[in-house]
């Protein structure tokens, strides 16, 4: 198992393909598996690898919670497609004296008792919440306007990037291109969200992260279901 060399374009492509239908490296919540792979990626993936970039930006937002994420961090070769071998650690990046920056801002030290307790508490809370079936789920229908930089922006790629955003409580719907003038068209796309899981701030943050394609995002309509 593995992703090849995650410092190389080929390895990032394997990661992008792997995440095409997944939100996380393992399971349905951020875990130490995501931390292990994130730390092996030296910089944000390019915009055309939209699945990998979406995952990278999402996991980066958990910087302060790194130690408390569930699971046990394993070697890179324990994650990824079964038919690909991990080679990320075969180069100079194995050295502890390299200049790579730990984007999580901490060393691989032993987990403190407080961090362990906090992680176990959060995991227990998550499992408890998952086991309870809510009587009523509040949902909203949102219409988003996603604007490109200019008339040369690849709108098909822009829409692909937007739809690559996956989250529990988010369902993408229909879309269309709407002329705005000077040959420029904006993407108008519908989505349904569960209010306690997905907000417009989260959508805007993840959509505008595709900055090579997206200039801005606006909420055109918002209706409770």
Curated annotation (Swiss-Prot):
Q: Which residues carry this modification: Phosphothreonine?
A: 88, 93
Is Ubl conjugation one of the keywords? yes
Q: Which residues form the signal peptide?
A: none
Its induction, per UniProt? By homocysteine (HC), may mediate accelerated synthesis of free thiol-containing proteins in response to HC-induced oxidative stress.
Modification N6-acetyllysine, positions: 7
One GO BP: translational elongation
The GO terms describing molecular function are: guanyl-nucleotide exchange factor activity; translation elongation factor activity
According to the entry, every stretch annotated as the GST C-terminal domain falls at 2-84
What name goes with this protein? Elongation factor 1-beta
Q: Which organism is it from?
A: Homo sapiens
